[in-house]
């Protein structure tokens, strides 16, 4: 998903009062803590969320880590491409103070560390696999991620999403029990053909591309739709009665409050 979420200019005055399974905290509670960090995941829990959306890619040594971009530049005090880093470099990277000095010393978590956090707090993970240019092959990317996932605490539920069809096919072949979600910013004209080609019944769609006719059709087909990344309950109010499954948001508190 985009590194920058759409936000309302004013704080909503009334929440949506949704069920906890309908609210996924985007990169954790990323409006109040540095995105994709353990602090953001704990903050999501503190706001009442029990599903956390987060991004995973590989370091140059093959370690799966929780980060959105192909570099550490935007969300840390350091610079450099993931492909040029190894796990031993993580301790020297401050992934918190860019957001607020309070979070100085926050680390980029490994996938294993994130899953341990989820197990501790009873969280489920909406894991977006990021495939960056000039990095690992699809097989290495999904293989290394799957190797960590299969050793997770069995209490941690995982849904896998990606913009990349090949990534979804690859990870799905490694574990057919995983829920797979197709990610789209805009709905392609051939969306029906794409979905027919992969074992998924879940769509993650930019909320700005969501329409009532589309939602009506996919719900009729038994598909689940989650809308990203919306921070104002009013923007999605008309869609819940039509079967919208969940929202992915930087502000889970707005959607869980009444």
List where the protein language model places each region.
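Phosphate-group recognition and catalysis centered on beta-loop-alpha active-site segments
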Residues: 1-258
């Amino acid at each position: 998903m985009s590194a920058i979420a759409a936000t309302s200019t004013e704080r909503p005055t009334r929440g949506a009062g949704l069920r906890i399974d309908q609210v996924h905290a985007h990169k954790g509670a990323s409006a109040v803590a540095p995105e994709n960090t353990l602090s953001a995941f704990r903050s999501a829990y503190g706001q009442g969320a029990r599903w956390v959306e987060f991004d995973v890619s590989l370091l140059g040594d093959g370690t799966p880590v929780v980060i959105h971009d192909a570099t550490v530049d935007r969300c840390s005090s350091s610079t450099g491409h993931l492909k040029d880093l190894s796990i031993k470099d993580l301790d020297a990277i401050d992934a918190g103070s860019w957001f607020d000095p309070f979070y100085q010393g926050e680390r980029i978590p490994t996938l294993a560390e994130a899953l341990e956090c989820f197990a501790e707090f009873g969280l489920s993970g909406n894991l977006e696999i990021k495939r960056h240019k000039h990095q690992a092959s699809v097989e290495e990317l999904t293989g290394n991620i799957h190797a960590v996932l299969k050793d997770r605490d069995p209490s941690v539920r995982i849904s896998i999403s990606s913009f990349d069809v090949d990534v979804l096919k690859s990870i799905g072949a490694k574990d057919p029990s995983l829920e797979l979600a197709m990610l789209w910013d805009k709905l392609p004209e051939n969306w029906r053909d794409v979905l027919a080609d992969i074992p998924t019944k879940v769509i993650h769609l930019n909320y700005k591309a969501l329409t009532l006719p589309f939602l009506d059709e996919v719900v009729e087909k038994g598909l689940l739709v989650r809308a990203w990344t919306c921070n104002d309950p009013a923007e999605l109010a008309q869609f819940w009665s039509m079967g919208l499954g969940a929202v992915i948001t930087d502000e889970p508190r707005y959607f869980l409050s009444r």
